């Protein structure tokens, strides 16, 4: 249920510094019981509604949407994934297109904080992501090592998705797909200038619940 934020993201994506004839904006309204689908349509997105009592969660919704996407008449070179509460830098698609033209097939963008000054919790999250982005992800990319997907701001060559499918459905589907790709000798690369602004938790309890979910997902992948 993302009716409060989805229009802002769709409007943001329509204003990127990229030929709007070369990309489409899809919204997956997964088991929503609010007005997410209607709001997204009114904002200009192509909305696909999914209702299922089995296979709940982001990973299952992505697999479902990819299957529908590949059956469409219009074909796409790549797919980018964003969370509903994100904002995207105007040059995001330009940066990703450059990486794709360079032969990179799975690419993670720079996840920045959308609300670093809201509370001390969101501030700590922002600092931790800034450190990881520079000291971990950028460093690994410069050393020729595979990076890790971050759940949003991800870009995939569609041929990779068609060939291997999307089989990542645990709580941390990003980590799961990163490992699956590495087992096929496909590294995840890093686009330092392809920036996404992600909303961070405001309270300690929100942070606790999110971290607990991530920890469970990482344990499942291991």
Please report, for each region that a protein language model flagged, where it lies by residue.
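Short aromatic/hydrophobic "clamp" motif used to bind/position activated sugar donors
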Residues: 79
